[in-house]
Amino acid sequence: MAEYIMAVQNGRNIPTEDKIFGSSRRANEMKAERGEDAVINATIGALLNDDGDLMVLSSVDDTFMGLEPEEYASYAPIGGTPAFRKAVVKAAFGTYQPKGFVEAVASPGGTGAIRNVIANYSCPGDKVLTSDWHWSPYGTIASEIGRSIATYEMFTEDRKYNTQALQAKIEELLAVQDYLVVIINTPAHNPTGYALTVEDWEKVVEILRNVAPEKHVALLVDAAYIDFAGDEEEQRAFLPVLETLPANVLPIMAYSASKTYTIYGMRCGADICLAPTKEIAEEFRRVCEFSARGSWSNCAKAAQSIIARIFSDEALLARVTEERAEIRDMLLARGKAFEEEAAKVGLTIVPFDGGFFVSIPCDNPDALSARLEQEGIFLVPLAKGLRVSVASVSEEKCRLIPARIVAAMEAEAQAQKNADEEAAAQA
């Protein structure tokens, strides 16, 4: 029986349901059946308070409520309003003043930003490089426009960032393709919570300095969670390192205003380049705007107006920054609690520094996730393990989950042992 009736597959692997949204749907169904207290839903990639309600910065909400109709109902320019494009650079870079040529192009969240970089800085059929632990929609975005994902092992055996594996994979891919997009999601990497150090970045840049001059690399920094990783200025300490790259390597930041300003549903982000020449920066803006026009036309104006207003009012900006710091501290406390309890019960987690997510390496994550769901604990199964959203559950629940995972692992291992013994007995 054909998998498709009228639609054309076009080489894509299209699941019947998104894993993350599917897990969350099942959690909500169990809540409706058994009650709120019977379920821990650690799948959601948004900040929720301890009662499970969405946390929205009141300062941002007040700004939204104060918009004039012209600020939300009229079309925005394809690349974003001038005020937004100026403000989003400040939002993304903080106090850092780039020395190169900067251009920003609006996108519907960080997802749109990633899409446009892949579309414009790689060729159909090319592989896009990222780490083995990565946000799974990278693969969806790539396949949707005729590319695919290649990965390198993110961590060494001593749990350090694996620059040797990165270098080997870059060399392997550039031996067969002239263009390469390298995606590095940091700080507060999704799904692990890891953040590259400045020393890590210096090694990455050294690797890219050795790329042959006739090759072209777009270094895409997916900084979606940068403002929830820790001190906002410390998390941007790597930015000057990016401006030491050679002319054939273009650093681009995919920035998510949707997350930083807790307006997830407004889908607001930007691609921001740090180009060595004016010509490269202008080309960046032109090609990204062209792709935007052919994909979503232009982005919703309301969020752009909110960001522009915030950065035009120092008192409002201070209020937003202070309020975000409060919920960031809550988030970091949850992550620390999970990390502490994992250590107590002997649960290995992937190196974690901060952010929305923690990951647990394991065999057969789908089976383990299904077992935990039977007990009312909903996590996201990945290729190499399980993802826990500490953003969406209380600190108390963050302390409960590790022991429950260990128990489920032991039960799953025993079930597999029993199955193997039964199979051997029947052989």
Q: Residue spans of the language-model regions?
A:
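Walker B catalytic acidic pair
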Residues: 223
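N-terminal small-domain helix-loop-helix segment of the aminotransferase-like
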Residues: 3, 10-109, 416, 426-427
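Conserved core segment of the aminotransferase class I/II
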Residues: 87, 243-324, 328
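Short Gly/Ser/Thr- and Asp/Glu-enriched loop/turn motifs at secondary-structure junctions
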Residues: 101, 351-357, 381-385
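Generic enzyme active-site microenvironment
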Residues: 220
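PLP-dependent enzyme catalytic core of the Aspartate aminotransferase-like
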Residues: 17, 90, 94, 98, ...
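Conserved core of the PLP fold type I
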Residues: 68-215, 226-245
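Conserved PLP-binding catalytic core of the aspartate aminotransferase-like
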Residues: 49-50, 321-372
